[in-house]
UniProtKB/Swiss-Prot annotation:
It comes from Streptococcus sanguinis (strain SK36). GO terms for molecular function: xanthine phosphoribosyltransferase activity. Its EC number is 2.4.2.22. The gene is xpt. Pfam families: Pribosyltran (PF00156). It is an enzyme of class 2 (transferase). Pathway: Purine metabolism; XMP biosynthesis via salvage pathway; XMP from xanthine: step 1/1. One of its GO terms (cellular component) is cytoplasm. The lineage of its organism: Bacteria, Bacillati, Bacillota, Bacilli, Lactobacillales. This is Xanthine phosphoribosyltransferase. Xanthine binds at residues 20, 27, 156.
Length: 193
């Protein structure tokens, strides 16, 4: 998605060898008009897949996932990172390691929101080592639902997340794919959509 790549180049900050800070439009402050376009692009890419639910993980995946769900006219579910006292039964859980935060969290979704009839589109803000997506896949599979695709706003293609997901048989759709950071500059490779 050319507009997203341009925004990353303009407002993204490279931190070290493998971190991209995009807090001015995605991971802290949200540019809703860009998120709306992102939602429309993902929706167009999966319009014939029979998707019934959009699933993400809190927190930065929520904004793009809401707009994807809106564009598809479907519910969006987000996995919670903290146990909530109102979530008391039928909880689906998985362990997820955060590359950026360097911590492992138990994420959960109430089982009543997913079932074996569902066809799921996973949406997340970043794909690095694939652990967030892997955790969501575990939860979705616990419900007996089918994963149709994993939609990623920004993929760090120089890390092994895509390979992990594709080797497991999942379709990955990334809007912006970063080949690497060279001397503090962002280098893109061809995106999926």
């Amino acid at each position: 998605m050319k507009k997203l790549e341009e925004r990353i180049l303009r407002d993204g900050q490279v931190l070290g060898e493998n971190i991209l800070k995009v807090d001015s439009f995605l991971t802290h402050q949200v540019d809703f008009s860009l998120m709306k376009e992102i939602g429309q692009v993902f929706a167009e890419a999966v319009k014939d897949a029979g998707i019934t639910k959009v699933v993400t993980i809190e927190a930065s995946g929520i904004a793009p996932a809401v707009y994807v769900a809106e564009a598809l006219g479907l519910p969006m579910i987000f996995a919670k990172k903290a146990k909530n006292i109102t979530m008391t039964e039928g909880i689906l859980t998985a362990e997820v390691y955060s590359f950026t935060k360097q911590v492992t969290s138990t994420v959960s979704i109430a089982g009543k929101f997913l079932n074996s009839d569902d066809k799921v589109l996973i949406i997340d803000d970043f794909l690095a080592n694939g652990q967030a997506a892997k955790g969501l896949i575990t939860i979705i599979e616990q419900a007996g639902a089918q994963i149709e695709a994993v939609g990623i706003v920004i993929e760090k293609s120089f890390q092994d997340g895509r390979q992990l997901l594709e080797t497991a048989g999942y379709r990955v759709l990334s809007l912006a794919r970063i080949a690497g950071f060279e001397k503090g500059q962002i280098v893109f490779t061809e995106a999926d959509i």
